[in-house]
């Protein structure tokens, strides 16, 4: 079981035609590794945990990871925290143009473990899940939520089930951008 939290710092440049948006965010991944029980609290070398879920963004178009750090948070349980600070362009996973330009969009950041099936990693939303208040430019944020999903084994060449987590931001276009 892997707990995933997030903090959205900013969001903008929603492009309904190119089906993408710009986002600045942090992802926090928490898991326990018994191999770290009794070790010294503090920074941990990346990749040193055999149970590292190796979480990645599945709808990244041009995403840059500016910093990554992993730390042992609780030596008595082997609790580890991996933090990633990312900024860039994400593809829209779902888009509705029914009321364009008077539209709302569910902008999503999808995360999944790299090549680890549900027997190894199950992603669960938890911990810090927040969005900074940022200037209401063209879009206004009405809320955010996290949802866990599992793939259909019939769509997999190996018949495996994979876990994923979607951070969903409900955005509405400000009326000043389409009413003159």
What name fits each language-model region?
Residues 1-180:
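Non-transmembrane, solvent-exposed beta-strand/loop segments in proteins
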